[in-house]
Every structure is written in structure tokens, then in C-alpha cells.
């Protein structure tokens, strides 16, 4: 690994690993080594959910669990994590196998998001829960300050459906047009057809559901421009 890139990443994270092997493992995709980051990702996913849930509980004492769940989902979903990964310039530090490198895996949102969760798991094991909580809240400070309960926290498919129903238009249709990758690391491409659109909008994701949500998000953006 390029030490300049690793040092830059740790500065952006706000944390220097004591156990360097944990950092390397967190950055290692399944395609690159048998000692990959998926166990750390599993751990980091749970820690992130706890930290964000706790922060929302403290910030919104009068908001019900439904709105808090939707706000948490917005904050921990894949594209939000991928945005954070890009803020860290994480793609340049990933350890990928030749196939993933060739297909542009360092830009793929699902890989970037999973690696952020793996880093959370790695930092927790390298330090403690208070330290990783402090870091997560720092990474999320602006997003936590800006988020609020309400309809905009509903997932894109729900918002698109309600938008169309409110105008007495047909519901959108979703079609899987491509599935790439091996069973453990697939990427789905979905076409979403909306009444009034001359062409389908496209969404991609690591599962059919995520790809459909991404396509619905693109449809909503297009509707807002019309």
C-alpha cells in the first residue's frame, strides 16, 4: 500500500490505527484476498446503526420511532456511505482483485459503502466504542444537523409511488436488465419506466431492491426538473 495514501486516509478519518493489519484488512475486498473485510463490515454496520440511532434519539425527543427509523435509514444507506467514502478519497486506498480493478470497483458505490463500515469495525477493535462513536458523529455532523423528520425521509420508491398516485398516474414498472459479478458481489441494473417519460431511468445497486431505489431516485430528480 502507498504510505502517502494511507497517511492521507488516516488524517481524513481523524484516526491513526495502532494495529496496522486491521486497517489493511478493512481496505481489502473479497476479490483480493481470503483475509477480506466482510467480518469487519458486519461489525461496523451494527455499530453505525447504534451510534446513529442513539444520536437521533437524543436530538429528537418528541419524534416517533417511525420517523426516527426513516431518518436512520437515510443516514446509513449505501449512497450516503459512498458519499462519505468519496470525502475520504477512499477509492484510491482499496485493495481489489484484478477483475474488480478492471471493472472500476474502486468507484462502485456498494464497495465504497461496505469499506466505510469495515473501517468502523476496524477502528472499534483497534480502540473502543467511545472512540468510534466520537469519530462517526464527527463524520456525520453536517448530515445530522441538516436532517429532519417528515415525508422526505421516505424511501425513493415510496415517494415516487405517492407522487404518481397523487396525480392519478399509473405506477412505475421496474425491470432487471443486467446482473453482473459473482453471487457474493453482484451489481444489478434496473430500468424504471414512468408514465410520461420517453425513456426509462436507470439505477444500479448491490441488490435488486437497492437498484430499484436508485432508479426511483433518478425518476424523482427528473420529475422535479419537469
UniProtKB/Swiss-Prot annotation:
Q: Where is the signal peptide?
A: none
Q: Which UniProt keywords apply?
A: Cytoplasm, Endonuclease, Hydrolase, Magnesium, Metal-binding, mRNA processing, Nuclease, RNA-binding, rRNA processing, rRNA-binding, tRNA processing
Q: Which SMART domains match?
A: DSRM, RIBOc
This enzyme catalyses:
Endonucleolytic cleavage to 5'-phosphomonoester
Tell me which GO cellular component terms the UniProt record holds: cytoplasm
One Gene Ontology biological process = mRNA processing
Domain of life from the UniProt record = Bacteria
Subunit architecture: Homodimer.
Record-given protein name: Ribonuclease 3
Q: Which organism is it from?
A: Pectobacterium atrosepticum (strain SCRI 1043 / ATCC BAA-672)
Amino acid at each position: 500500500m502507498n504510505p502517502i495514501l494511507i497517511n492521507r486516509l488516516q488524517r481524513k478519518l481523524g484516526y491513526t490505527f495502532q494495529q496496522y493489519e486491521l486497517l489493511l484488512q478493512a481496505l481489502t475486498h473479497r476479490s483480493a484476498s481470503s483475509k477480506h473485510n466482510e467480518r469487519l463490515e458486519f461489525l461496523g454496520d451494527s455499530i453505525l446503526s447504534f451510534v446513529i440511532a442513539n444520536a437521533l434519539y437524543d436530538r429528537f425527543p418528541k419524534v416517533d420511532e417511525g420517523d426516527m427509523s426513516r431518518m436512520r435509514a437515510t443516514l446509513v444507506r449505501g449512497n450516503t456511505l459512498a458519499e462519505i467514502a468519496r470525502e475520504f478519497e477512499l477509492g484510491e486506498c482499496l485493495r481489489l482483485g484484478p477483475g474488480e480493478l478492471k471493472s472500476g470497483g474502486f468507484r462502485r458505490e456498494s464497495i465504497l459503502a461496505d469499506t466505510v463500515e469495515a473501517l468502523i469495525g476496524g477502528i472499534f477493535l483497534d480502540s473502543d466504542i467511545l472512540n468510534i462513536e466520537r469519530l462517526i458523529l464527527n463524520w456525520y455532523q453536517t448530515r445530522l444537523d441538516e436532517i429532519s423528520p417528515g415525508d422526505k425521509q421516505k424511501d425513493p420508491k415510496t415517494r415516487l409511488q405517492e407522487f404518481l398516485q397523487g396525480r392519478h398516474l399509473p405506477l412505475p414498472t421496474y425491470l432487471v436488465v443486467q446482473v453482473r459479478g459473482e453471487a457474493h458481489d453482484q451489481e444489478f441494473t434496473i430500468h424504471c419506466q414512468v408514465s410520461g417519460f420517453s425513456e426509462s431511468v436507470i439505477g444500479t445497486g448491490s441488490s435488486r431492491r437497492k437498484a430499484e431505489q436508485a432508479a426511483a431516485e433518478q425518476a424523482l430528480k427528473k420529475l422535479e426538473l419537469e
